[in-house]
């Protein structure tokens, strides 16, 4: 949410560490309920399509976890999703806020109402079709520059004009 942007500018380590910790703990708690040890690869992104500050993670999670016998166990909630997305969103927000409050109590109190005003959305995608798809996805987020050449429409002495997707519309 936008409420963490000013904190991300002034206390970036706090925000970024909290994103990773809350994500991992959320995933682990859902896995534990199904008696699975989960895994995750997470990549931090600090900007959005419009190049505005938008700290968020892109996480790749296997379609299951390791059970108490050391065996991989596939798991699905409904359709192709591992866990219920609305529940993930609620638990993630609670864990993020709890950790932020512990690390930066004064700032947390300043933005607390904004953090709880709207629901948070954990975006989930259907599973990748192949290992190649996983590598391509990771490549887009680990080797990406802010404005790739295909988005640039014009450049002059003072301006760069580029295309972007407005995800809020």
Question: Where are the regions a protein language model picked out?
Answer:
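Beta->alpha loop/short-helix hinge microenvironment recognizer with preference
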Residues: 1-169
